[in-house]
A protein has these predicted regions:
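Basic, flexible Lys/Arg- and Gly-enriched helix-loop patches that mediate nucleic-acid binding at interfaces
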Residues: 1-148
Length: 148
C-alpha cells in the first residue's frame, strides 16, 4: 500500500512526501504542500538531522562510532557525511545522519560490520515520532515545529 493511499482523498491532491522511506523501513515521514519546506528538509546543505533506530546482525567494528563520526566512503567511492552512532545493545543502536542517500543507513552500517534487520526513522529535525502513534496513523504539525 502506498502512503498517500492511507490519507483522505480530498487531502491527497495537494500533498507529497518529504523524502522517502524504503519498503522495509517504517517511521516518521513528513507530508506537505510546501515545496520550499520539502527542499529545505531534503537538501544536504540544510544539514537537517534524521535519527533512526536500528536492529542489526553481526558485530560492529570496535571503531564504529569513530568511523561514523569521521564520515565513511564505500567501495564505489560514495562518500557519507559524518554521522553519530549511539549503541543501545549488542544488536541495536541509534544513528543520526544529515543527508539521505539511497539505502544510506543500511550501507553505512554494512561498512562498520552490521547488517540491518529492522529500521525505523524516529526523528527529523525537531520532530520526534510519538511512540504511541500506530503504523499508518498521522498527526498534524506546523511549519514552526520543523523550523524551530
Amino acid at each position: 500500500m502506498m502512503l498517500l493511499d492511507m490519507l483522505p482523498s480530498k487531502l491527497v491532491q495537494k500533498l507529497f512526501p518529504v523524502g522517502r522511506l524504503d519498503k522495509d523501513t517504517e517511521g516518521l515521514l513528513i507530508i506537505t504542500t510546501d515545496g520550499k519546506l520539502s527542499h529545505f528538509v531534503t537538501s544536504p546543505t540544510s544539514n537537517i538531522q534524521k535519527t533512526y533506530y536500528i536492529e542489526f546482525e553481526g558485530v560492529l567494528n570496535d571503531r564504529a562510532s569513530k568511523m561514523m563520526k569521521e564520515g565513511l566512503v564505500d567501495e564505489k567511492g560514495t562518500q557519507f557525511k559524518p554521522a553519530t552512532l549511539y549503541n543501545v545493545s549488542e544488536t541495536s543502536c541509534y544513528l543520526t545522519i544529515s543527508e539521505g542517500k539511497y539505502h544510506q543507513v543500511k550501507r553505512m552500517m554494512h561498512l562498520v560490520g552490521g547488517v540491518v534487520t529492522y529500521l525505523k526513522r524516529i526523528k527529523i529535525a525537531n520532530i520526534v515520532l510519538p511512540e504511541e502513534l500506530k503504523i499508518g496513523a498521522y498527526i498534524e504539525i506546523s511549519q514552526h515545529d520543523i523550523y524551530q
